[in-house]
Amino acid sequence: MPKPLTEAEPIVREALKKAGFGILTEVDVTATLREKLGVETRPYKILGACNPGIAHRALEADPTVGAFLPCGLAMYEEPNGETIAALQNPGLISQSFEAAGLAAPANEALELLDAALRTVAQAVLA
């Protein structure tokens, strides 16, 4: 995104919210590394996004899938001021489990996350 992290993050959060995801966890990697190691790094955050209905169906299919919840979204700022977002692919996670019931929730999550990314793209290009 051609925006710094401080401007991109609210756009991403709103897009996730519109797609039915809540943010359960937030890690300010920059602040954590500064506090723990005394180092300065690029602006970097990790958000844990969850759609409760999808998570419930996935956990019903295989309780061990909880080790991969919530869906991780890493956002960091490049030296040129642009923000890069990297998103966990729920479809790949479902392939790691034998439970047949995981494919449908994983595909639904992937579709909703894709919709959120399209919303972000539209907001950035507007």
Q: What name fits each language-model region?
A:
Residues M1-A126:
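Feature detects long, helix-prone N-terminal segments enriched in hydrophobes
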